[in-house]
Amino acid sequence: MRLTSAMCRRGVGLSLGAFLACISTLAATPVDPSGAVSLPAVSIPYSIFASDEARRQFVESMMDPSAPPPGSSIEATRSFYDAFNSNLVSRMRKRYAAVIKTERIGGVNTDVVTPVQGISPENQKRVLINLHGGAFMWGAHSGGLVESIPIAVIGKIKVITIDYREAPEYHFPAASEDVAAVYGALLKTYKPSQIGIYGCSAGGILTAESVAAFGAKGLPRPGAIGTFCGSAVDVKGDSAFIAPILDGQLFAEKPLSAFDLLYFKDVDPNDPMVFPGASTTVLARFPPTLLITGTRDFAMSSVVRSHELLTQAHVESELHVYDGMWHAFLIFPELPESNAPYSVIAHFFKQHLGQ
């Protein structure tokens, strides 16, 4: 039987062998010797596994024209994201009743978030540190509250979010030095096993950096950590190319690297204090690690690779990948796909932090 393209498209009355031949025929795409694939123009539907709420938020986020364009002043960028995050904080507080107070710890400004209903008995001697996202340039205060409020309330635990130093005023390793200062101060009250650290995007990268820095400074490792939409290796791999397309952006021949960020000016890309995945020895000192990402997150491959490297280093590592979810999707409180990881995060620290 001679296969035609029409028969393949219909797929009716074909044997298994013919059906597989059709797949091969229809899916054939030029692949060069390096493994690079040239793709034709395609229309990719949104994930059938994602919620209606996620679909609406995805469209709204990707079509929002109000974000400042690349090259905008740092003042304009910070102003935009502070307003953006402040709106999210208001939405968070309608769902999650929290008490917020500012406190200077270890010489660093922080916001301390606790649940209105009180900290659970098992968490009285536990604390979480949040490291906010924002490309190491924005996210102080409001961005940290977005990431801290739901975890504090769902987990019934105290969360301290740190306003670490950012670019362009400061560069690596200023942020991890601030985290170490707060962590060191908390060690006067808590055992290291009672302290957890987590962050999203830049905060996920900073969480991994901070654990590496603790080891270099002779500080004990914390009880557990979470790195979300950013982790122990640079933003590379398939998702760095594919996710922008899935998010409706133009294809980039050279995707953005963390080393393009102002914060990492003039750093050594092989320095394990920047990306601990560069050293198995450094990774082997990591505590149990929770990793979260989405299939439309440009950092997905780096998070998956971090999980793989942690596993190879015999570190307990737990990976969750949410279908159809984009970078830092956890900041939207209305999504079922955000509420699911909130519970995962709370449970992970409940299971791994000491009493």
What is each model feature region?
Residues 31-35, 44-73, 94-355:
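Alpha/beta-hydrolase superfamily serine-hydrolase fold, recognizing
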Residues 1, 28, 88-95:
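Short, solvent-exposed secondary-structure boundary motifs
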Residues 22-30:
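Bacterial Sec-dependent signal peptides at the C-terminal "C-region" and cleavage site
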